[in-house]
Design a protein with these regions (language model features):
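Generic beta-strand/beta-sheet core signal
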Residues: 116, 181, 189-190, 201, ...
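Phosphate/diphosphate-binding loops
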Residues: 167, 215-216, 223-224, 231-232, ...
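PRPP-dependent phosphoribosyltransferase catalytic core
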Residues: 169, 184, 221-223, 227, ...
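Conserved short alpha-helical segments that host acidic/polar catalytic motifs at enzyme active sites
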Residues: 1-230, 235-238, 242-296, 302, ...
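Secondary-structure transition/capping motifs at alpha-helix termini
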Residues: 136, 157-158, 293-297, 315-322, ...
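A conserved beta-strand->alpha-helix junction
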Residues: 140, 145-148, 321-332, 427-447
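Flexible loop/turn segments at secondary-structure boundaries
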Residues: 92-93, 123, 187, 195-196, ...
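Short, glycine/charge-rich flexible loops or terminal/linker lids adjacent to PRPP-binding catalytic cores
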Residues: 318-363, 374, 401-407
């Protein structure tokens, strides 16, 4: 990632498991899965287990290994627990409170529900106001709590939780991939436009797994079955052990999966929409080589997400691939989030140049994006200080110009280096010999097997859903109609 001081962040990762055979420690399985999904959220995490219909859980601020000590994990393990859900969350600093950690457990007149959410509602302010006017009391500031209230209210009026979920989907706008656990059911839900990924796996001894990415299935020994379709509700009923699909909200022609899942967010060993993330990133590099050919001696990538695209650029161009940087694996998040002086030093501490790879050579440098531009400039300076003769910066995504309202934490639009600048002006900021971005035409062709369309609003400013709020994930910070003046709904 180009900007270590102010990186892009995915909001969350979700997981759920039903072990029909009763041979799995489902709490331990959830722990392993959350480890695999840690890249999707590092602020808080949680696990809820279903012990013979009784749902309990633990959630807190911190990384998976910090929150779930052996003692905590042991307290969640039970011989009769056949179901569990898990969640990792990223949030802005202002919302880093335990009340927003998930799974959220709700107890009501019809039972108990644990809910995990990845995404961001665009009408959360309006829905929350309506609920508050009806007497609802909120304990946190996330839109996940809004979803919980709506499902609970509908459940009290309807015969099944899946019917209540379907009714709730009628009023939700924006991005949501959910894993929900009741006393007898494990349920996966994906919004009708399919903004965030969600997949289904099968356990070798019988049972099912839901997860944001297939890498979490691999972590628990499950086999990838398929993706949850946009708009689909998938229900595992523990009374029968069967998998049922409800498709009342399926079939929208304007599916909008976040294309940045393939560019940066997802782990390269994951498969999303029948497409390898690793291969999609290599394809981005191939397209870059076709669009922006240069004469050079070596191609290198910025660890970690720039490496696959760099390999693709090398393969397409015939320019040798090299290891240009060694990444410090032990630098902590506290360092990056510290003082301004620490931010200035973060690139040099986190990355060190392999001088023998670049000294005296014309270098093609590949990264997944440029956010503010300051970190890209420092990386280029590191290469020049190590003796690189030329540095040609290639970006495996189009320029970031607009905020995201669907679950990606993008810095203030005014801080985005591409906003209001030409390609030449951006290059003046970062100081490369040449600069090339992947085109909008090619970015939607990265996952050739995908059945859904892609959201590229952060590049184009064209939103499939009317933007409602400012960038904060904190619902208190959102204001109706507060959106960029040049942002528009698709088709406008």
């Amino acid at each position: 990632m180009s900007d270590f001081a102010y990186p892009l962040h995915e909001e969350c990762g979700v997981f759920g498991i039903y072990d029909r055979a009763g041979t799995e420690d489902v709490a331990a399985a959830a722990y392993s899965a959350l480890y695999a999904l840690q890249h999707r959220g590092q602020e808080s995490c949680g696990i809820a287990v279903n012990d013979d219909g009784v749902i309990t859980g633990h959630r807190d601020l911190g990384l998976v290994n910090e929150v779930f000590t052996p003692e905590v994990l042991a307290s969640l393990s039970a011989n009769t627990a056949h179901m569990a859900t898990g969640h990792v969350r990223y949030a802005t600093a202002g919302t880093r409170v335990r009340a927003n950690a998930q799974p959220m457990i709700v107890r009501h007149g019809r039972g108990t529900m644990a809910l995990c959410h990845n995404g961001n509602l665009t009408n959360a302010v309006e829905l929350r106001r309506q609920l508050e006017n009806e007497g609802a009391i909120f304990h946190g500031s996330s839109d996940t709590e809004v979803i919980c209230y709506l499902i609970t209210r509908n459940r009290l009026r309807m015969g099944s939780i899946e019917t209540a979920i379907s009714k709730t989907m009628d009023v939700l706008e924006g991005a949501y991939s959910l894993v929900i656990m009741s006393a007898t059911k494990l349920i996966a839900v994906r919004d009708p436009r399919g903004y965030r990924p969600l997949c289904i796996g099968t356990l070798p001894g019988g049972g099912y797994v839901f997860a944001s990415e297939s890498c979490a299935l691999d972590a628990v020994g499950a086999a990838l079955l398929r993706d949850v379709e946009p708009g689909e509700i998938v229900v595992v009923d523990t009374k029968t052990g069967e998998l049922r699909s409800i498709k009342d909200h399926c079939g929208r022609p304007d599916t909008q999966m976040c294309v940045f899942e393939f560019i940066y967010f997802a782990r390269p060993d994951s498969v999303i929409e029948d497409s390898s993330v690793h291969e999609a990133r290599k394809q981005a590099g191939r397209f870059l080589a076709q669009e922006h050919p240069v004469e050079a001696d070596v191609v290198i990538g910025v660890p970690d997400s720039g490496l696959d695209a760099a390999l693709g650029y090398s393969q397409e161009s015939g320019i040798p691939y090299g290891i240009g940087f060694i990444k410090n694996k032990y630098i902590g998040r506290t360092f990056i989030q510290g003082s301004q002086k620490q931010r200035e030093n973060s690139v040099r501490i986190k990355l060190n140049v392999v001088s023998s790879t670049v000294k005296g050579k014309r270098v093609v440098l590949v990264d997944d994006s440029i956010v503010r531009g300051t970190t890209s400039a420092r990386i280029i300076k590191l290469l020049r200080d190590a003796g690189a003769a030329e540095v040609h910066f290639m970006v495996s995504a189009p320029p970031f110009k607009y905020p995201c309202y669907f679950g990606t934490d993008i810095p203030d639009q005014k801080l985005l280096v591409a906003t209001g600048r030409t390609l030449e002006q951006i290059n003046e900021v970062i100081g490369a010999d040449t600069l090339g971005y992947l085109s909008n035409e090619h970015v939607v062709q990265l996952a050739k097997n995908a059945k859904c369309g892609f959201c590229t609003a952060c590049f184009t400013g064209e939103y499939a859903v009317e933007p409602e709020s400012v960038l904060s994930t904190d619902i208190h910070d959102r204001h109706l109609n507060d959106r960029p003046k040049d942002a528009k709904k698709l088709g406008e």
